[in-house]
Regions:
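Aromatic "clamp/platform" in nucleotide-sugar-dependent glycosyltransferases that forms part
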Residues: 179
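Short alpha-helical donor nucleotide-sugar binding micro-motif in glycosyltransferases
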Residues: 158-159, 166-171
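Carbohydrate-associated surface elements
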Residues: 56, 75
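A conserved mid-protein helix/loop that constitutes part of the nucleotide-sugar donor-binding site
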Residues: 97, 101, 106-120, 141
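Short hydrophobic beta-strand element within catalytic cores of glycosyltransferases
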Residues: 196-199
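Short, structured helix-loop element that forms part of the nucleotide-activated donor/catalytic region
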Residues: 59, 123-152, 156, 163
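Acidic anion/phosphate-binding donor-loop and adjacent secondary structure
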Residues: 26, 76-91
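Membrane-proximal helix-turn-helix segments that form the acceptor-binding/catalytic region
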Residues: 31-50
């Protein structure tokens, strides 16, 4: 960005990462967080234009750097509503029989809280945690250890296509207990399927569900 400005080329910084990336748990050891934070500062100072995904991040740039940005939110495809078939055959799931989390299995998604809270709830519903590990398998193993002994908690692994459609289409509730987000695609998708959504009280989720 510095060199581009020196040579009088316009620079548009597209901050489409999910949230303020340097705050993520995976960057807190070593120099990762400082390096990414410096990149954020450079974007605010030197880019000709900055694009953000959420009003929360837009407010952050205004309050932190006095920088005006352009808000261009995520969008999703029209949903394919499907009856439970594949998910019944593979996981024994039926319509309204489970609470769904679907997303990357990373610490900032709040899945630890979800598992711990669910284990204390008396319900016949299952908790379906759908998604793959983003960086390493260590967090996935931590979650499975946390869920050990509760047969209601199901890990599906990465899903796509008709399987993903069925999970969204037949969930009793979709939940996203994140600590940190940009504009969560999985929440937008869940809402497009008409799901009742239970989300954490952070601006990036609140501005999507509104009420």
């Amino acid at each position: 960005m510095l060199f581009s400005n020196l040579f009088v080329k316009n620079v548009v910084q597209d901050l489409t990462s999910a949230g303020i990336d340097w705050q993520r748990e995976k960057w807190q050891s070593g120099l990762g967080s400082k390096f990414i934070h410096q990149g954020e500062k450079n974007a605010a100072k030197y880019a000709d234009e900055v694009i953000v995904l959420s009003k929360g991040v837009q407010d952050y740039f205004k309050e932190t750097y006095g920088r005006e940005t352009h808000f261009i939110p995520n969008g999703v495809n029209r949903p394919q509503i499907r009856e439970a078939s594949l998910i019944t055959d593979k996981f024994g799931l039926k319509k309204d029989s489970y609470i769904l989390f679907l997303g990357r299995l990373v610490p900032e998604k709040g899945i630890r809280y979800l598992v711990e809270a669910f284990k204390n709830v008396k319900t016949d519903k299952k908790l379906v945690i759908a998604g793959g590990s983003s960086d390493t398998d260590s967090f996935m193993e931590e979650l499975k250890e946390l869920a050990k002994g509760d047969g209601r908690i199901l890990f599906t692994g990465f899903v796509q296509g008709a399987m993903l459609d069925e999970l969204y289409s037949n969930a009793y509730i979709y939940t996203l207990p994140s600590d940190l987000e940009g504009m969560p695609l999985s929440l937008l998708e869940a809402m497009s399927y008409g799901n009742c959504c239970l989300v954490s009280d952070i601006p990036e989720c609140a501005e999507v569900v509104e009420d």
